[in-house]
Amino acid sequence: MEIAEPVTVRCSTLVVRGDCILLCRRPTTDIWVLPGGSPRRSEGAWECARREVSQETGLAVTPDRVAFVLDATSPKGEQHLFEIIFSATEADPSATPCGTEDGLAPSFVQLDALRDLMLLPPIGERLRAFIERSPDRVAETASYLGNVWGTIPEPASS
């Protein structure tokens, strides 16, 4: 029996302000990522995305819809990531992101600058195209169904 390799589940959020996108920079490596992280036990993807944005940037958001779902395997195969990226609405569009988590520096970055950044996973052009094609970030997205696992019904008695 083959043992499955671990897959990291990540819930991220796409927050757009004008022609800028919210990203978090890891200063030690100069890698940029969307704000996000892995869900806690019993935490839905939507809740995880909202919590991670708050923890990493200090901003309050409400995820709207699924913008992307992706698989990413690192070039050497040492990491496999499954990521759900939600579009989101800010509670206060004038709030300034602040680094609340060690090792991350959040900021709004111009869409035109995405091509010059080390964004991981490397989806900068897809993000840019999505935002330009869908300014309201609702068109061409999928619905998030949440936790659909219900209780198993008892068998009918004969």
Residue ranges and their predicted role:
Residues 1-6, 35-39, 74-82, 153:
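Short charge-dense sequence patches
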Residues 30-32, 101-158:
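Nudix hydrolase/Nudix homology domain
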Residues 1-34, 61, 65:
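N-terminal strand-loop-strand
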Residues 39-62, 72-123:
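Unchanged
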Residues 20-55, 149:
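Conserved Nudix-box catalytic region and its N-terminal flanking loop in Nudix hydrolases
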Residues 20-23, 95-99, 138-140:
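Short, well-ordered strand-loop elements centered on a beta-strand within folded domains, enriched
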